């Protein structure tokens, strides 16, 4: 493996083999430079949630900026996988020269609407599919899970503690960033803190107490070396040993330390948090926080709150960073138009499963916002050249059950797509994480509460324009007619 300098010197091979096989087919057939349009979207909202939070654009930008096959990549493709030298030489000069339109990170996204649109030579658009899906599928999933948890926690602090349970190192780092986009305040991952300039937070492990054998000594030694102190109190006996020793050390050190609080990592968190709060208050530490961890997620936190738990800070790890209850988003990347004789021709994929029938053509996504109450009426997918006139009433109808419709007036239409790359040139600046966090909250304020319920939310409208819907029906008819003609000829 090291023969090819395998040190992750590029991400261009972060793809499925069939992408390279298709690229060679396009190239040898001379259609590789045809302009193609692909769209990235998902079919079902994760966690049975009412919305998803888009994350992954920064990583996608980094990937596309550096999309280039290295010498070691090409040596591997030729020597080990058997690609011919002429194709290898073509790949040597390849980079991303297309355009990317995308929703911004922190945008609320919904099923069957294009999150990203790639307009590029066919071979380039094909080769980047796997990586873009890999990036968006994971990070959007984690940001959405984080937003669900934060929605339950409210104004209390949420900390990302999942690094050791993440699926690997980069997943931990980018997952930490996605968690902050979803509303978390800090991460335990120091690498993520350095890489993204985000807050880091941490306490100590049970090993510290075990190493010193008793809690008093362990807490005292920790206080001697750290100004900010959170003591983990459940190594032996939370109420009879951990809490009394934490309070003892906090009193002994006084103003020499910043006694932030205590952490509970096991046991009956509702009962223990109430007892710990009482002990802290009686000792005069009314500002000290009760921090809880231990396989938390939005459902557990809701139950703890229902039981009156006195928890101020929530450390969430495994069930966030692994998207424990739904470990895959299922986003797809589909060809919607391709160049034929100098003109763009819409393409469609048809399936016996209605939800897998794609919507053809180059499209835009608008958020239709009521100007009176500042709430969203739904998202409106239109063909690229259509004009959404906010001076006229707009008909919105369900794309499958078309009898479900409404007319909207007094609205403004927000175009959700931003130009990120134009002909291979980056023309977008990534915002700060704090700005993305605020953008999420601003977007959530547009939704009615019914769409934000943790359990059984109302379905948010994602509608097609009449032209977009008619175009889809026409393409379905054309494909079916062509198949019938071919069968008759046989």
UniProtKB/Swiss-Prot annotation:
Keywords linked to the UniProt accession: Ligase, Phosphoprotein, Pyridine nucleotide biosynthesis, Transferase
Organism expressing this protein natively: Bacillus subtilis (strain 168)
CDD domains: NAPRTase_A
GO molecular function: nicotinate phosphoribosyltransferase activity; transferase activity
UniProt entry tagged with the keyword Phosphoprotein: yes
Gene name for this UniProt entry: pncB
Record pathway: Cofactor biosynthesis; NAD(+) biosynthesis; nicotinate D-ribonucleotide from nicotinate: step 1/1
GO annotation, biological process: NAD biosynthetic process via the salvage pathway
UniProt modification remark: Transiently phosphorylated on a His residue during the reaction cycle. Phosphorylation strongly increases the affinity for substrates and increases the rate of nicotinate D-ribonucleotide production. Dephosphorylation regenerates the low-affinity form of the enzyme, leading to product release.
Top EC class of this enzyme: ligase
Family: Belongs to the NAPRTase family.
Sites of Phosphohistidine modification: 206
Protein name (database record): Nicotinate phosphoribosyltransferase
Record EC number: 6.3.4.21
């Amino acid at each position: 493996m090291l023969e090819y300098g395998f040190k992750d010197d590029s991400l261009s091979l972060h793809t499925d083999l069939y992408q390279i096989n298709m690229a060679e087919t396009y190239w040898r057939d001379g259609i590789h430079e045809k302009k193609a349009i692909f769209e990235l979207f998902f079919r079902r909202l994760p966690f049975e949630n009412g919305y998803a939070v888009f994350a992954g654009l920064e990583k996608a930008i980094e990937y596309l900026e550096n999309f280039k096959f290295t010498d070691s990549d090409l040596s591997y493709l030729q020597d080990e996988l058997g690609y011919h030298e002429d194709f290898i030489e073509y790949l040597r000069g390849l980079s991303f020269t297309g355009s990317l339109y995308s929703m911004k990170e922190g945008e609320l996204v919904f099923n069957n609407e294009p999150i990203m649109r790639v307009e590029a030579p066919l071979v380039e658009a094909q080769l980047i599919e796997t990586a873009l899906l890999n990036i968006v599928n994971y990070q959007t999933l984690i940001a959405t899970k984080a937003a669900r948890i934060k929605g339950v926690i409210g104004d209390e602090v949420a900390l990302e503690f999942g690094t050791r349970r993440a699926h690997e190192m980069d997943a931990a780092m980018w997952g930490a960033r996605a968690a902050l986009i979803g509303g978390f305040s800090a991460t335990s991952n120091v690498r993520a803190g350095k890489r993204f300039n985000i807050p880091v937070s941490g306490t100590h492990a049970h090993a510290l107490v075990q190493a010193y054998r008793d809690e008093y000594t362990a807490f005292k030694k920790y206080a001697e070396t750290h100004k900010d102190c959170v003591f983990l109190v459940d190594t032996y006996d939370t109420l009879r040993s951990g809490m009394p020793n934490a309070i003892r050390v906090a009193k002994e050190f006084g103003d020499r330390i910043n006694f932030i609080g205590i952490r509970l990592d096991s046991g009956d968190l509702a009962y223990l948090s109430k007892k710990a709060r009482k002990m802290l208050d009686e000792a005069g530490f009314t500002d000290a926080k009760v921090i809880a961890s231990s396989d938390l997620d939005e459902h557990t936190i809701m139950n703890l709150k229902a039981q009156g738990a006195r928890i101020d800070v929530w450390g969430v790890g495994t069930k966030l960073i692994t998207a424990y209850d739904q470990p895959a988003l299922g986003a797809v990347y589909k060809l919607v138009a391709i160049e034929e004789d100098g003109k763009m021709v819409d393409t469609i994929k048809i399936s016996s499963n209605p939800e897998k029938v794609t919507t053809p053509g180059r499209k835009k996504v608008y958020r239709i916002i009521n100007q009176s109450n500042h709430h969203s009426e739904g998202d409106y997918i239109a063909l690229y050249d259509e004009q959404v006139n906010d001076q006229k009433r707009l008909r919105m109808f369900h794309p499958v059950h078309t009898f479900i419709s409404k007319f909207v007036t007094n609205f403004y239409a927000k175009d959700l797509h931003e130009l990120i790359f134009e002909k291979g040139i980056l023309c977008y600046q990534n915002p700060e994480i704090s700005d993305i966090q605020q953008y999420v909250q601003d977007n959530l304020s547009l939704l009615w509460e019914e769409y934000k319920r943790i359990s059984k939310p109302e379905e948010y409208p994602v509608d097609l324009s009449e032209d977009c819907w008619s175009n889809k029906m026409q393409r379905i008819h054309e494909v079916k007619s062509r198949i019938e003609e071919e069968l008759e000829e046989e």
